[in-house]
Amino acid sequence: MAMAGVTEKSDKVSAGSAQASQPAQNSKVAKPRIDCIDGCRFALVFPIILGHFIRFGTDNKRLLKLLTQENVLVGGFFSISGYVAAYTTTNLRERSHDAKKFKEPELFFWQKVMSYYPLHFLVSTLGAPMFIATDRLMKNSWGTTGMHAFLNYSLLQAWFPSEAEIWNPPTWFLSALTFSNFTLPAILPQIAKLSKDGLHKLLVGLSGISLLQKLSYSQAWKFYCCGGFAEKTAHPYLWNVTRFHPFGALVEILIGSAAARSVMLDDEKHQPSVNPLWLFLASYASLGLRLTTLNLNDAMIRTLLFMPLYTKFLMEIHRDCLMEKPHLITRFFGSKLMTSLGALAFPMFILHGPLGQIFYKKKIAEKLWGGIMPKRFFPFYLLLVMVAGHFTNEFFVKSKKVQQLSAWLARKLADATKGMLSDSEPMKRDNSMEKLAGA
């Protein structure tokens, strides 16, 4: 889904087969399938899952430093989300958007939400007894517990830095993503109008805004750190705003959208400027700074190094997959194995938190097992997450009944909120600039 899709149907990077697609009667260029983007999802989600619970699997400090940087990698998910959203809603080699996609902006929004909310609702409801028990064991009042339930089901938790990691902590991502989906019907058509020059300036501007936020956090705390497992930030709420806030997520999503549009405006003979492998390795190698004297905090690594390199990687692997002989890494991420694993990224992401709480949340594990599970159990936990993700994907995410119900709900919600994302009195066309140009 949105994990980018975050595996969702509406975000699938497949507007048609490259071999079978034919130009439409209106002469618009058909978009080829780029499965390699879907295959990249698993390479992001698996280290994030590792990072959340690796401290229960090893005492090796170097490994812990290296693998507990999930807050760096999550930027890649936002970039992919924006990349796919722009690719599926704007026109190839044209400075325009697909009017049909945004004809009903409310429907666009609710379809996006319904591509991930059913699984979130299912896991939240099945896990509610455990989540509520945890709240009560932590001496939270029933009022606080009720507020946590409301924030979880309404996907509003990312707006509240003190509550962002309630119940199923990784779902703050969905909370931030929902706000971005709310804004995209207004923003993407404007981005689609930009030339390559305008898109480049937009990328620079958005990156600068993102960097300012990270500089603000770093100035308030410090620029260097030993890793989240070794030291805690002195300003946890500021840290939550820095990594969770929906506005920050929107900036990174739009970076991905601008990158996709830049590639979509390439001419047919445009070649990749570099083997995508080097950009992929460089982006992940930025995590290695944690093992050096240049051990910048996660926020700085994410914005200064990982995001620019990973976004450039997405652009080049996109270009490369359109070539007659794509590079090995492009074929690998576009392979059946990686696209299948990419489809598991979203259910694994949603499930790994509750499963981890069962085995590693102290108050819960003590009640169930007498204590947290030993380190030798950690590989079995990872296997359980993958198996659970597979069955959830096969029997819930792919379920025709679930998809039909989601589509029906999206339609009903769109009808109920008609006009929410559009002006009931659109402005009449203003010809003043045309008259001025003529004069």
Regions found by a protein language model. Name each.
Residues 189-198, 263-274, 295-297, 329-332:
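Membrane-interface helix-boundary motifs at transmembrane edges
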Residues 34-35, 62-74, 163-176, 216-255, ...:
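Interfacial loop-to-helix transition and helix-capping segments at the boundaries
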Residues 116, 135, 153-216, 243-246, ...:
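Hydrophobic alpha-helical segments with transmembrane-like composition
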Residues 71, 129, 245-249, 253, ...:
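Alpha-helical transmembrane segments of multi-pass integral membrane proteins
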Residues 5-28, 411-439:
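Non-transmembrane, juxtamembrane loop and terminal tail segments
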Residues 33, 61-63, 86, 103, ...:
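Membrane-interface helix/loop caps of multi-pass membrane proteins
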Residues 46-53, 129, 158-159, 206-219, ...:
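Aromatic-anchored segments of alpha-helical transmembrane domains
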Residues 71-78, 90-136, 141-155, 178-184, ...:
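Transmembrane alpha-helical segments and their boundary/interface "anchor" motifs
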